[in-house]
């Protein structure tokens, strides 16, 4: 009793404090609860939304020839979206959270009805549902972001129903445009009303069970003549990016005058489109689609592009093809054209597609076929669950196929409800091209023609893993094959199956394997042929315009030009001579990456210049080569494990699948998020401390990495506050505070901001470093004594003065920093030059204008080929 009375007395005395604490806890709980509805349970989803968390290497799985990884987890408590008129100026994400929060507290906001047409009465029940379908544009409305998608008729965002489900709410919160949000809302409302998906699909195939197991390769039968004339092939080349030389090499390898080539270039790849249009003018049987789409990985737009291309190919006068084969620019043949034509001529009634295997339920879950998706804003949004229509025998596994003309005609022109309903189903499906044609064929009258083989060889290195590489464009975990390397060459020569193509090949990753395969098929080039070990890839072309450049690349290319012109001037031996003194004119006209023997050799910058001697305008090309900055400081067994920590090993655009930085040369600006990567030889386990030091000797961060005996690569992106201070940074590796090695990298001092020369003011903060020298919440400056760093004050004063620079003084500082990391390896003249020391670019071995026979297309030879 005494204890009870004492407790009551304490409660009365502190009841205000207790009530306040409980209120705060309740409020925090409500906030966490309301925000959690917008997140996904899956760790990979959180990794996509919180960029500072490294991806879990175990995320995702990959089956042979299938791109989807593990499905997102389900079962989270659903939130709701209740439509309402949006207040002007209120961000959409905040609206979503506010509405969700209000729902949690019990308030109900009814859906906002669509504007009432003049003379039209309000509807309810079935009539209201019918009006909703009509207003949303399905099935008779406008075309949306992808074919068949209901598109809004204005820019207002008004949900026409009460949207239920965490996936739909999350998509609405993350979509960046109101049109996309409205499309998502329309699709979800139709789906909730049961008006979006077909309930059942007719089945015309009388065969039970799965498709044919495949046709083995028979070398003897392959040499026997086929009945009837040789088949003719329509190649559909689906390309994007800037690798025109690799595309030319592919076309050179597969070209024959009896075949037809139709090229679709992604709408975002304007440089490649210009080059392909020019290429197609040389050959009557090569054409470019007069239309272009943005085709994202896993998107419904890819299937739409294929169907439209198929219709085009069927309607080209005089193109009497027998088979449709799709290729990308990263494909390459593994057998000759003669072998392919002979094989298809003996199997002219077969359709070749790769199946996922026997476990249908696992394939459905892994591919997300039981989920509803919609594509808009160049993203595939997961919107909830759905039922697969009755009658469908789901099949698929690869979006690379070889199809007969008769089947293509059936898919494009038929009035069969089977195809129409499957088109509707796959409009809202992830990775539709990996399953649509398989499923149509599996239940169509032509099901007996299906062969389980897509004629491709791919490689999936599970040790390196997919790393959920497409999560920034799809709400799912997926990946693509690894690139082939020289050690894979024997696999490309396999003869057990009739495979005729392999993927993927990337010359910026490894060109040697492309050469090996090319020489194996068509023989070596003559001795002394130039350019066989070189590769060039354009990264900027003048018609792209200044808007295609970032402030970092704009600063860098201008600095490269100035450094190159100083080199040209210094090449003069006669004092006072001005014929080699040039001034740059405008932007560079082009910039290329240059590789030799599969090693990055630097940037080639082509620049229009004016001679100081008042001569005619000229064009020069300058080669800027990166300088190594690795220092191996230790001598222990542990130190010997460190293979490379060199320039380019701190950078951005890290590709964990190929283990390289796609940002070649490590071009970094103050707003970038750099990654440090180390390569290790096998050896004893060790724990390494990594320390980042900025140009003023501020210890920005420190962390430990565990290097197991079998570890080959380690990498980490510390969550540093930005802007980073421009100048030379240092990354040190230590074990027990004894040095193993260090590398330096450059954060480029920007001379441009928003494409304009940097001026004094708030934007000059871009070169002043973070506020209060704080890169992390935790200070690591206490390590400066252990690291024997110089005093901060002199370096900080120099940095303060640099932050005030503009104009030529800022350019001089930028060029000085650049010259510590890049050297001018060569300068040449595109045409005749007044400077006697400049060699013509076409006579050099390194210029982008030097001969490159392996990627040059010429006239068709007597045998109908180019190679």
UniProtKB/Swiss-Prot annotation:
Residue ranges that the Swiss-Prot or TrEMBL entry lists as coiled coil: none
Residue span of region Disordered: 41-122
Superkingdom of the source species: Eukaryota
Keyword Transport: no
Keyword annotations of the record: Disulfide bond, Glycoprotein, Glycosyltransferase, Golgi apparatus, Magnesium, Manganese, Membrane, Metal-binding, Secreted, Signal-anchor, Transferase, Transmembrane, Transmembrane helix
A single Gene Ontology CC term: Golgi membrane
Pfam families the UniProt entry points to: Branch (PF02485), Xylo_C (PF12529)
Listed Basic and acidic residues bias regions: 53-65
Function: Catalyzes the first step in the biosynthesis of chondroitin sulfate, heparan sulfate and dermatan sulfate proteoglycans, such as DCN. Transfers D-xylose from UDP-D-xylose to specific serine residues of the core protein.
Protein name per UniProt: Xylosyltransferase 2
């Amino acid at each position: 009793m005494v204890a009870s009375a004492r407790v009551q007395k304490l409660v009365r005395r502190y009841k205000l404090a207790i009530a306040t604490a409980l209120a705060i806890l309740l409020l925090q709980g409500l906030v966490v609860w309301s925000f959690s509805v917008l997140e996904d349970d899956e760790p990979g989803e959180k990794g996509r939304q919180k960029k500072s968390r490294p991806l879990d290497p175990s995320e995702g799985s990959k089956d042979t020839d299938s791109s989807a990884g593990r499905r997102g987890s389900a079962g989270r408590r659903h939130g709701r979206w209740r439509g309402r008129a949006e207040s002007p100026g209120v961000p959409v994400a905040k609206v979503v959270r506010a509405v969700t929060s209000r729902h949690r507290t019990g308030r109900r906001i009814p859906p906002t009805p669509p504007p009432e047409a003049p003379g039209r009465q309000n509807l309810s029940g079935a009539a209201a549902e019918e009006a909703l379908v009509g207003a949303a544009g399905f099935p008779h409305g406008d075309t949306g972001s992808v074919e068949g998608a209901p598109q809004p008729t204005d820019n207002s965002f008004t949900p026409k129903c009460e949207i239920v489900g965490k996936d739909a709410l999350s998509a609405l919160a993350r979509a960046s445009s109101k049109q996309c949000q409205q499309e998502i809302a329309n699709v979800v409302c139709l789906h909730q009303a049961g008006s979006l998906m077909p309930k059942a699909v007719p089945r015309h195939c009388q065969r039970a069970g799965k498709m044919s197991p495949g046709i083995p390769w028979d070398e003897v039968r392959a040499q026997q003549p086929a009945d009837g004339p040789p088949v003719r092939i329509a190649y559909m080349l689906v390309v994007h990016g800037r690798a025109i030389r690799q595309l030319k090499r592919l076309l050179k390898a597969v070209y024959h005058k009896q075949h037809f080539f139709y090229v679709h270039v992604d709408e975002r790849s304007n440089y490649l489109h210009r080059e392909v249009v020019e290429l197609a003018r040389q050959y009557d049987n090569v054409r470019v689609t007069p239309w272009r789409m943005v085709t994202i990985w896993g998107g419904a737009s890819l299937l739409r592009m294929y169907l439209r291309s198929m219709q085009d190919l069927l309607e080209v006068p005089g193109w009497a093809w027998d088979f449709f084969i799709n290729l990308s620019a990263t494909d390459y043949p593994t057998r000759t054209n003669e072998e392919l034509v002979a094989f298809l001529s003996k199997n002219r009634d077969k359709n070749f597609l790769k199946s996922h295997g026997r476990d249908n339920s696992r394939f459905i879950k892994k591919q997300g076929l039981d989920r509803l998706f919609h594509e808009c804003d160049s993203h595939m949004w997961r919107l909830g669950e759905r039922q697969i229509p009755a009658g469908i025998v789901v099949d698929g596994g690869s979006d690379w196929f070889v199809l007969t003309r008769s089947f293509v005609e059936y898919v494009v022109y038929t009035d069969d409800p089977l195809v129409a309903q499957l088109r509707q189903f796959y409009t809202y499906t992830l990775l539709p091209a990996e399953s649509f044609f398989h499923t149509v064929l599996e239940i169509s009258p032509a099901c007996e023609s299906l062969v389980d083989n897509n004629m491709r060889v791919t490689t999936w290195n599970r040790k390196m893993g997919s790393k959920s590489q497409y999560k920034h464009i799809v709400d799912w975990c997926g990946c693509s094959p690894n690139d082939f390397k020289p050690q894979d060459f024997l696999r490309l020569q396999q003869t057990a199956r009739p495979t005729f193509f392999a993927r993927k090949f990337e010359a910026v990753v490894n060109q040697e394997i492309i050469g090996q395969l090319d020489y194996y098929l068509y023989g070596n080039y003559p001795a002394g042929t130039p350019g066989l070990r070189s590769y060039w890839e354009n990264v900027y072309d003048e018609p792209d315009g200044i808007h295609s450049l970032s402030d970092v690349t704009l600063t860098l290319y201008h600095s490269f030009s100035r450094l190159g012109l100083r080199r040209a001037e210094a090449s003069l031996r006669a004092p006072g001579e001005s014929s080699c003194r040039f001034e740059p004119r405008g932007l560079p006209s082009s910039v290329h990456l240059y590789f030799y023997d599969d090693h990055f050799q630097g940037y080639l910058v082509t620049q229009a210049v004016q001679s100081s001697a008042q001569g005619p305008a000229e064009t020069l090309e300058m080669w800027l080569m990166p300088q190594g900055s690795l220092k191996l400081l230790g001598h222990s067994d542990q130190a010997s494990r460190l293979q490379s920590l060199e320039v380019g090993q701190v950078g951005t655009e890290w590709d964990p699948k190929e283990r390289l930085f796609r940002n070649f040369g490590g071009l970094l600006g103050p707003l970038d998020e750099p990654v440090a990567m180390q390569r290790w030889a096998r050896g004893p386990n060790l724990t390494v401390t990594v320390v980042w030091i900025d140009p003023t000797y501020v210890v920005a961060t420190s962390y430990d990495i565990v290097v197991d005996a079998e570890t080959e690569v380690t990498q980490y992106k510390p969550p540093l506050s930005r802007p980073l201070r421009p100048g030379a940074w240092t990354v040190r590796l230590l074990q027990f505070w004894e040095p193993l090695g260090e590398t330096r990298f450059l954060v480029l001092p920007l001379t441009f901001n928003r494409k304009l020369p940097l001026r004094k003011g708030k934007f000059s903060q871009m070169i002043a470093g973070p506020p209060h020298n704080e890169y992390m919440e935790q200070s690591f400056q206490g390590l400066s004594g252990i690291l024997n760093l110089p005093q901060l004050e002199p370096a900080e004063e120099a940095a303060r003065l640099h932050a005030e620079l503009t104009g030529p003084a800022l350019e001089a500082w930028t060029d000085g920093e650049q010259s510590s990391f890049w050297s001018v390896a060569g300068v040449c003249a595109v045409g005749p030059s007044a400077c006697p020391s400049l060699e013509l670019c076409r006579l050099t071995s390194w210029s982008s204008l030097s001969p490159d026979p392996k990627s040059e297309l010429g006239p068709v030879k007597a045998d109908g080929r180019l190679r």
